[in-house]
UniProtKB/Swiss-Prot annotation:
Protein name: Ribosome-binding factor A
Coiled coil regions in record: none
InterPro entries the record matches: KH_dom-like_a/b, RbfA, RbfA_dom_sf, Ribosome-bd_factorA_CS
Keywords of the record: Cytoplasm, Ribosome biogenesis
BP GO annotations: maturation of SSU-rRNA
Signal peptide bounds: none
Any one Gene Ontology cellular component term annotated for this protein: cytoplasm
Free-text function comment from the UniProt entry: One of several proteins that assist in the late maturation steps of the functional core of the 30S ribosomal subunit. Associates with free 30S ribosomal subunits (but not with 30S subunits that are part of 70S ribosomes or polysomes). Required for efficient processing of 16S rRNA. May interact with the 5'-terminal helix region of 16S rRNA.
Organism annotation: Campylobacter jejuni subsp. jejuni serotype O:2 (strain ATCC 700819 / NCTC 11168)
UniProt subunit comment: Monomer. Binds 30S ribosomal subunits, but not 50S ribosomal subunits or 70S ribosomes.
Subcellular locations according to the entry: Cytoplasm
Amino acid sequence: MNPSEIKKLRTESILKELIPEALANLDDENLKNLCVVDVECKKGRYDAFVYLDKMFFNVHEQEKILSSLKKASRALQNYCMSEQGWYRCPNFHFKFDDRLEYQNHMDALFEKIKKDKNES
């Protein structure tokens, strides 16, 4: 692992801790309780994709939350910069995490294949 990869992983780890703290400091009740599942920085650390837990939000609520997060993005960046003493913070791109649903779907398919194989 080269030094740039280590810096990227360190940044991801720090952001995974700081973003929930920053969200908790906001006045918006919808944003305070969001759960950050993962943070993925792109090469160069100019952009960070922040994956959020869907919990029990419907599509309309998700769109509303993403819109609010886009507006609050600069405040979140300022919080991260002030906490870490950074002169620059990655641009945040928020997404709801579909990986768990995808994994559950794949597991169900494999179980079905296994069951069909045993019946044959």
